[in-house]
C-alpha cells in the first residue's frame, strides 16, 4: 500500500449563488490532486481520520447522494437523512428517500439548514453551482479512477482553512 499525505481544505463561495435555497449546501469529498474520487464504484483509499471527520460533520444532517454512491454502501448511513438522487423513476431504497430532481432532493432536505452532498462525481457537478461550502480532503497523488470531483474555479471559491496531515499507518490505498 502507498502512504501519502493529505490536507483538509475548506472553501467558501465568494458571492451569493444565483439560486438561493436558504441553506448552507455543503459538498464533502476526498479527492486526489487529479480530482479522482473512486474506481469501480468504490473509494480509492481508506483514511480513518477522514472517515471519522465525515461522520462527525454529517451526523444529524441530510445527506444527498447519487444512486451509485448509495449502492456502494452496505446500508443507509445511520443518524442521517439519506436522500438518493436518481433518474430511475421506479427506484426504491430501504431507509432512504428517493428524489428525481435537484429541487426535489433539496425539498426533502428542507428541515436541515446544512444538507451535505456526498457524491458521486455527477452529483457533485450538479450541486457545485448551488453550494456555499466545500469540505474537501485533498489526497496528494495521482490515482486511476472513473469518478472525479469537478474542478474548483478559484474565481468563485476562497480557501478559508487548511490543515495538513502526514501519512499514517491507518491509510489504505
Each language-model region and where it sits:
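Flexible, gly/pro- and Lys/Arg-enriched active-site loops
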Residues: 22, 28-173
